[in-house]
Amino acid sequence: MSVLRALPRVARVVRPAPPSLRSISTTNTIFKSPTADPFPLPFSDPELAHANNSLPSNSEEWPLPEPLDRTGEDEKTLRARLIYQTRKRGTLETDLILSTFARDELPNMDFEEMKQFDKLLDEPDWDIFYWSVKKRDPPARWKGTPLLEKLQKHAKNEGKVVRMMPELMQKEPDL
């Protein structure tokens, strides 16, 4: 009983916090619309904050970035770029398949085959992976092409070879 008498009574009315201490989520007057950016960048265009930048719900309808125009690229530069692009894609599975394929097939490719391989590398990583392991049907532009058939055969790995990322330079460059 003495413990209850020692506790102070909390019988006063709780008042709301002053506006300066309220959280942003309770302050509806700051935002003009529910889609407005609550944290705009300092020098950003205010029109961009109100733009509708929604993507379609189906990921296959998303716009792909346009590949860079590489007209006038010589064969040596193209070959070096293809070696780099097959190694540094960002998806380990695709990197292993493409880099070992490039190690085995790129030295024997002519310029037109390398340009076609370059166009294949412009496709999304997971699409290339699923086409090469035959989990999805490739689109009409790639279906039945000799390049994709070679890639599918390489990905099948009939010899059950343990694949690792190949060395970047297999021989000293000619200077």
UniProtKB/Swiss-Prot annotation:
Compartments in which it is found: Mitochondrion matrix
Residue stretches of biased makeup (Polar residues): 51-60
Pfam families cross-referenced by the UniProt entry: Sdh5 (PF03937)
Ranges for region Disordered: 42-71
GO biological process annotation, one example: tricarboxylic acid cycle
Membrane-traversing stretches: none
One term under GO cellular component: mitochondrion
Keywords, alphabetical: Chaperone, Mitochondrion
Extra facts: This protein may be expected to contain an N-terminal transit peptide but none has been predicted.
Similarity comment: family membership: Belongs to the SDHAF2 family.
Subunit: Interacts with the flavoprotein subunit within the SDH catalytic dimer.
Function: Plays an essential role in the assembly of succinate dehydrogenase (SDH), an enzyme complex (also referred to as respiratory complex II) that is a component of both the tricarboxylic acid (TCA) cycle and the mitochondrial electron transport chain, and which couples the oxidation of succinate to fumarate with the reduction of ubiquinone (coenzyme Q) to ubiquinol. Required for flavinylation (covalent attachment of FAD) of the flavoprotein subunit of the SDH catalytic dimer.
The protein's name in its UniProt record: Succinate dehydrogenase assembly factor 2, mitochondrial
Organism this protein belongs to: Cryptococcus neoformans var. neoformans serotype D (strain JEC21 / ATCC MYA-565) (Filobasidiella neoformans)
